[in-house]
Amino acid sequence: HSNGQDVDILQHSGIYEPLAQLKQEGKIGGFGLSGKTVEGGLLALQQGDCAMVTYNLAEQAEKPVLDYAASHGKAILIKKALASGHACLTPGVDPVRASFELIFAHPGTSSAIIGTINPVHLAENVAVARAVLTSTD
């Protein structure tokens, strides 16, 4: 994960070069950055294969990174998809379903990281994700 200095990390850390070499040698399948800025996310995708971005009902500033990924065949991992457990909506609206509908509707989304320590919540989230992903409406 980046500390927020995404561009500086990508331009000065030297980490992407050995990762690119490992990919070329077939030792890894791909590489990317878990960033915090649009500029860093775009640069990560230009130089690598994927980016991990925050995208949820409350935070959508990194949407341009998803748009770029969709148009360039790059992968996106969504972090904080459920707003760190704080996704809240009006009464009667399921915040988990609404969150999944948002993130999986974007063609740039490859996967979402959904964390929980509660097995019941995990099962419920999987069921909702499955319903959203198989929905025809």
PLM features: residue spans?
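Structured C-terminal cap/extension of enzyme domains
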Residues: 21, 42, 47, 63-137
